[in-house]
From Swiss-Prot:
CDD domains: RNR_PFL_like_DUF711. Signal peptide: none annotated. The lineage of its organism: Bacteria, Bacillati, Bacillota, Bacillota incertae sedis, Caldicellulosiruptorales. PANTHER family: UPF0210 PROTEIN MJ1665, UPF0210 PROTEIN SPR0218. InterPro entries: UPF0210. This is UPF0210 protein Csac_1314. Homodimer. Belongs to the UPF0210 family. Pfam families: DUF711 (PF05167).
């Protein structure tokens, strides 16, 4: 049950601290839609998505009106399409991608994920064909999101697919160059990808998730920052306790939305993702929380320490507020989506190397990083390999969403607008990892994988 006091606190957090729910995401299984005939699969898929998500926009609007709580995005996550299209030609795959995008537009769904593949071990020809279709799929759509999982702690790392993905990302950038290579913002590479992630671009409906489920992603960095503004001289343990209490309140709001959305749509409740997700708005920034904790500028020494503390406190507070938690659950540090992170880059305090260190203690990884358009494909692959290694050897989810902005050089600005924000093109290490990446093969799982 939710008390009147909790609802009043939620309303106050909305008014004073930019609290919102980042997304209600409906996960939908497409296994019963599969067919060797592409058009039949598309028709079946369309009926299934309309059945479960046809009323998503209206229900989200109802919840906004009922609680005065903004819901930023309405999203859908599908069974990984690569699992259902083994026999399809390249052209058939693009028809499926276009059909998914058209359904999303028709239902006014902001983003739809699941044009995805998992390639932990062998990189077979069917999967290679599917991954090769991603650049054209993203270039010809507006709302479709795509992801590839290249390793797990139990399976190791697939360097063959990582080597290919450097070229895929360059190709996406080239094919969406008229929009500052925006297609790359809808593609992410994962290690240990969760099956119930409500956030894009990496959301898909995992094979064990049932016919459908609702997952909710919270936001609320502004709430935490505002609470810390009253703790200027507090000890670090008091800071930790304050963050934990605020995370509890934010997550209760997410649980409230999850409960009502489940009832209104008649879809089982999935999880609340305990992630603080920033927006480009001033005062809604993870970087500003870290600076409120005591950093002069995010990216300076102490940033990894402060972020680790924030991440752990958010999880502990959130876990008390919702029984079913999952997804990515932590603090997000997407550069272009966080006005404070952008300022850190512009000031020269926040580098790619420091971001990589910070990703070892928080949710996801190198996210919404804009790099020069002439970066070599092997350098992108090596960025991915570094980040995936952090995930595999620390048994956590990590990811890379990098934008090699076509025609842009270091220091230029790219503006995606909306939630994706803007960023300066960051400097990169120009030494070549080509010989390492071209070795290919599989990296065995680490010894911590032997847990039975």
């Amino acid at each position: 049950m939710f008390t009147s006091q909790e609802i009043i606190e939620t309303i106050n957090m909305v008014k004073q601290s930019n609290l919102d729910i980042r997304t209600i995401t409906v996960g939908i299984s497409l296994f019963d839609c599969s067919s060797d005939i592409p058009q039949r699969f598309i028709d079946n898929m369309r009926k299934k998505i309309i059945k479960y998500a046809g009323n998503l926009k209206n229900v989200a609007n109802e919840i906004e009106d009922m609680f005065g709580l903004p819901i930023v995005n309405r999203r859908v996550a599908l069974t990984p399409i690569s699992l259902l299209t083994f026999s399809y030609s390249y052209e058939d795959l693009l028809k499926v991608a276009l059909a998914i995008d058209e359904i999303a537009k028709e239902l006014e769904i902001d983003l739809i994920g699941g044009y995805s593949a998992s390639v932990h071990k062998n990189y077979d020809e069917n999967t290679k064909k599917f991954i090769s279709s991603i650049p054209d799929a993203l270039a010809s759509t507006d709302r479709l999101c795509s992801s590839v999982d290249v390793g797990t702690t139990r399976s190791g790392i697939n360097l063959d697919v990582i080597a290919h993905l450097g070229h895929i990302i360059k190709d996406i950038a080239q094919k969406t160059k008229d929009k500052d290579s925006f297609g790359c913002a809808r593609f992410v590479v994962f290690a240990n990808a969760p099956d119930d992630n409500p956030f894009m671009a990496g959301a898909f409906h995992g094979t064990g998730e049932g016919d459908s489920a609702i997952n909710v992603g919270i936001s609320g960095p502004g709430v935490v920052k505002r609470a810390l503004e009253g703790k200027k001289d507090a000890s670090i343990d008091e800071v930790y306790e304050t963050i934990k209490k605020m995370a509890f309140k934010i997550t209760r709001a997410g649980q409230l939305v999850l409960k009502y959305a489940s009832e209104r749509l008649n879809i089982p409740m999935g999880i609340v993702d305990l992630s603080l997700a920033p927006t480009p708005k001033i005062g809604d920034s993870i970087a500003e929380i870290l600076e409120e904790m005591g950093l002069e500028k995010v990216g300076g020494y102490g940033s990894t320490f402060a972020l680790a503390l924030l991440n752990d406190a958010v999880k502990k507070g959130g876990a008390m507020a919702a029984s079913f938690t999952g997804g990515l659950s932590g603090a997000f540090i997407p550069v272009s989506e966080d006005s404070g992170m952008v300022k850190g880059v512009e000031a020269g305090a926040l580098s790619l190397e420091k971001l990589e260190a910070m990703t070892s203690v928080c949710s996801v990884g190198l996210d919404m990083i804009v790099v020069p358009g002439d970066v070599e494909a092997e350098v992108i692959s090596a960025m991915i390999a570094d980040e995936i290694a952090i995930g595999i050897y620390n048994n956590k989810t990590t990811a890379v969403r990098v934008i090699p902005a076509y025609g842009k050089k270091e220091g230029d600005e790219v503006n995606f607008g909306g939630l994706l924000g803007r960023s300066k093109v960051m400097s990169i290490n120009k030494s070549s990892p080509k010989r390492l990446i071209e070795r290919g093969g599989r990296v065995p799982p680490p010894v911590i994988s032997l847990r039975n």
